[in-house]
């Protein structure tokens, strides 16, 4: 017991700076919260440092938001067999507390000694629900969007397009509270879009609206195969390293280590701190991040042959709205859509954001290559978003620009903005006609309908 108290003191001293874990070979700090894959808290990515201010010679004409829901509790699974589910983690927590998974508290400086005083915050009754942090994330993003684009808010009522899952709808509501305050209900028209096949090409849950993709389990088959290889490679050394912190009679498993890591991630999402995070090294955080990146890349992102099909319908809809800027009968300027992380990555892949990753040049599953474009921590953390801006500039031309979590994405395939420099802007027609995305901007909806054998819909929704 004395050993545990002493080591808790050392652990507390470490936790004071736990957010800034140092790499031994790096001078800069390692911020582990920015490397939790799709479960990372909201943060801005590190691109090329392009200025996100409006260009001096341009006026904003349209803004299009594709927004992920905020930080949440683990998802639900009544069978309690999915390691990342609330029910599984709830059971795992109970085993840690009742000794079914026996921690060796007599081991000198055991980093798990805190468990004796630990109060779990993951509760199966809260499965799928936003955390208070998630609500605040969306409220603040709504406030910031209004401050930035207030000149465009000249209509009385705005369509709020949202996938119908509860946490997405709630996220949209908190966002619009940030936009409009107590006038939210009179200023908004919520359009709840089915997360099943009924939505067709209007879907904000493209996987589920594409019967060929969903019914053939393309997502699950691809990701399961990738994870089976990578997890056996990178988690086994963690099992061996952590085994000494448990009683010798207990055989620590890969799923145990995954559970410890998920508790770290979800406690961050719920209360912004977790002692469990201190048991992992920087390189282990990066390998778990890579595991998340493999999931998105193979499941429907740039490694998948389906990426442009799944993302193309949204891009086609977006492109039609951009083209309509010169239509005097088209007066929409603000376009708001709310969805999940796995539906943003295919859109960004189809836009050409991840040119180094293709079906022919996939992310390897037997090693972490570290330098690659599709970092889910940067592109789709909790509350992550993709913003498309349309400007009219002093040269009498329209220009497009993308922001990822408020940072300018450096478009390089369609020329420059009016400054003549690489500023992230592309002239509208060059953007629409670039070989990288022309098929999606012109034919994305018809391709989705054909390849997916999607359900036809006569409803017009504007993204």
From Swiss-Prot:
GO terms for biological process: energy reserve metabolic process; inositol phosphate metabolic process; organophosphate catabolic process. It comes from the Eukaryota. Gene3D superfamilies: Phosphoglycerate mutase-like. Glycans are attached at residues 98, 104, 221, 324, 439, 458. Its EC number is 3.1.3.2. The active site is at 69 (nucleophile), 341 (proton donor). Belongs to the histidine acid phosphatase family. This is Thiamine-repressible acid phosphatase SPBC21H7.03c. It comes from Schizosaccharomyces pombe (strain 972 / ATCC 24843).
């Amino acid at each position: 017991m004395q050993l545990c108290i002493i080591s808790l003191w050392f652990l507390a001293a470490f936790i004071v700076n736990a957010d800034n874990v140092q790499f031994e070979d790096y001078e800069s700090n390692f911020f582990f919260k920015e490397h939790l894959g799709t479960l990372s808290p909201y943060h801005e990515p590190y691109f090329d440092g392009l200025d996100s201010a409006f260009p001096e010679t341009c006026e904003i004409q349209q803004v299009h938001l594709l927004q992920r829901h905020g930080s949440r509790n683990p998802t639900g699974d009544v069978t309690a067999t999915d390691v990342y589910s609330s029910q599984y983690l709830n059971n795992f927590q109970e085993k840690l507390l009742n000794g079914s998974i026996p921690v060796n508290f007599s081991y000198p400086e055991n980093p798990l000694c805190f468990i004796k005083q630990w109060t779990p915050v993951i509760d199966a009754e809260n499965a799928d629900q936003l955390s208070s942090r998630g609500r605040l994330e969306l409220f603040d993003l709504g406030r910031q969007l209004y401050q930035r684009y207030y000149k465009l808010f000249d209509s009385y009522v705005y369509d709020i397009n949202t996938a119908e899952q509860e946490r997405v709808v709630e996220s949209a509501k908190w966002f619009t509270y940030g936009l409009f305050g107590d006038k939210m209900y009179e200023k908004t028209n919520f359009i709840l879009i089915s997360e099943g096949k009924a939505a067709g090409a209007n879907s904000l849950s493209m996987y589920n609206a594409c019967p060929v993709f969903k019914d053939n389990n393309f997502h699950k088959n691809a990701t399961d195969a990738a994870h089976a290889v990578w997890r056996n490679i990178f988690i086994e050394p963690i099992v061996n390293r952590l085994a000494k912190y448990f009683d010798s009679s207990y055989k620590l498993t890969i799923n145990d280590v995954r559970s410890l890591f998920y508790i770290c991630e979800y406690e961050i999402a719920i209360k912004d701190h977790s002692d469990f995070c201190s048991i992992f090294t920087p390189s282990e955080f990066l390998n778990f991040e890579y595991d998340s990146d493999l999931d998105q890349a193979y499941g429907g992102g740039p490694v998948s042959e389906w990426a442009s099909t799944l993302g193309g319908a949204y891009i086609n809809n977006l492109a039609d709205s951009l083209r309509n800027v010169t239509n005097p009968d088209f007066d929409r300027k603000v376009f708001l859509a709310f969805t999940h992380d796995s539906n943003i990555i295919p859109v960004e892949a189809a836009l050409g954001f991840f040119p180094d990753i293709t079906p022919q040049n996939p992310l390897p599953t037997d090693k972490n290559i570290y330098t690659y474009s599709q970092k889910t921590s940067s592109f789709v953390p909790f509350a992550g978003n993709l913003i498309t801006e349309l400007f009219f500039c002093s040269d009498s031309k329209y220009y497009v620009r993308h922001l990822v979590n408020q940072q300018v994405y450096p478009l390089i395939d369609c020329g420059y903005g009016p400054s003549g420099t690489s500023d992230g802007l592309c002239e509208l027609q060059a953007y629409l006609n670039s070989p990288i995305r022309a098929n999606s901007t012109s034919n994305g909806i018809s391709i989705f309908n054909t390849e997916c054998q999607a359900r036809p819909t006569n409803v017009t929704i504007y993204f």
